[in-house]
Amino acid sequence: MAGNTFGQIFTVTTFGESHGAGLGCIIDGCPPGLELSEADIQFDLDRRKPGTSRHVTQRREADQVEILSGVFEGKTTGTPIALLIRNTDQRSKDYGNIATAFRPGHADYTYWHKYGTRDYRGGGRSSARETAARVAAGAVAKKWLKEKFGTEITAYVTQVGEKKIRFEGSEHISQNPFFAANQSQIAELEHYMDGVRKSLDSVGAKLHIEAANVPVGLGEPVFDRLDAEIAYAMMGINAVKGVEIGAGFDSVTQRGSEHGDELTPQGFLSNHSGGILGGISTGQDICVNIAIKPTSSIATPRRSIDIHGNPVELATRGRHDPCVGLRTAPIAEAMLALVLIDHALRHRAQNADVAADTPDISRSDK
């Protein structure tokens, strides 16, 4: 299987399956001298891990990270950083009914045709459990970006199924199981999700991700545009079916006089570009929206076929998220961080000595 490595300078290679002994990643290209402990990484893993509320999968995993290499006396050495997360709560017997049948909406059918074999236990490597390794790597990237530039990356859920969530303040995001920036709607969301779960069905979600204090100049102007690589990173997350940068699809109904972000000596007057122009960061907040499809694993019987092409009816057993989007925020933050750190290091390699005389107006209002 190819395609398990992300990045050009700050590279992350993930490994492991949902019901294997464990999963993890190898980070190469991390600058030396970054203070790093397992606690720095564990914070984000705890935000992503399963079993944290009745609205997510009840699989119980501690997701305790182990740093195996690349850190000495509390600091990165510049050598590969190996991170390991052991699986402890696999229940593979729940998947016996899909050993020779394909679950609708899953990668079972495509994996079988591509590789001629598949690990059906919990979806194997196609499971969203793989994203724990990305979150671990992203935590390292986030810490370096914060120390180097003061970059802060925040993600929150803006819609669950038909329920739109009003923004009240980022301080609410960590106070509820929905990663919602609104505490007043939590009871409504809990009632809604209880109904979804009891109906043996699932729903999708929409998330907003922002990166503040990003330096001007990250990204390349043609194929490696910053917005293109952000979209690539987000689309690589399980269940993501759409990505918007800045105004996104709302740009269709805007006039050029509205959409183009005007500049003044005091700063930009708007941010419809989402912090990126010509594939290069402007220094404004980078703003991204992603759409998450409904969880494919549901207990409602559905039609499919087995490996011989015979019709079957499948009701997925096991422990699954009725809305996988509720645990996507730390994953999306991690992927944005991995894009930004890689481009920051690429920019430093080529353009470290470049200095423009024009003031950085993105900093004028900070």
From Swiss-Prot:
Residues that hold NADP(+) according to the record: R48, R54
Segments traversing the membrane: none
Cellular-component GO terms for this entry: cytosol
Pathway(s) per entry: Metabolic intermediate biosynthesis; chorismate biosynthesis; chorismate from D-erythrose 4-phosphate and phosphoenolpyruvate: step 7/7
UniProt remark on cofactor binding: Reduced FMN (FMNH(2)).
Functional description taken from the UniProt entry: This reaction introduces a second double bond into the aromatic ring system.
Residues that hold FMN according to the record: R125, S126, S127, N238, A239, G278, K293, P294, T295, S296, S297, R319
Domain of life of the organism encoding this protein: Bacteria
Self-association and partners: Homotetramer.
PANTHER family referenced in this protein's UniProt entry, alphabetically: CHORISMATE SYNTHASE
Cofactor annotation: FMNH2
EC number: 4.2.3.5
CDD domains: Chorismate_synthase
Enzyme class: lyase
Database matches in InterPro entries: Chorismate_synth, Chorismate_synth_AroC_sf, Chorismate_synthase_CS
Membership in a protein family: Belongs to the chorismate synthase family.
Disulfide bonds, paired cysteine numbers: none
This protein's record includes keyword Flavoprotein: yes
Name listed for the protein in its UniProt record: Chorismate synthase
Reaction(s) this enzyme catalyzes, per UniProt: 5-O-(1-carboxyvinyl)-3-phosphoshikimate = chorismate + phosphate
GO molecular function, one term: FMN binding
GO biological process: amino acid biosynthetic process; aromatic amino acid family biosynthetic process; chorismate biosynthetic process
Keywords assigned: Amino-acid biosynthesis, Aromatic amino acid biosynthesis, FAD, Flavoprotein, FMN, Lyase, NADP
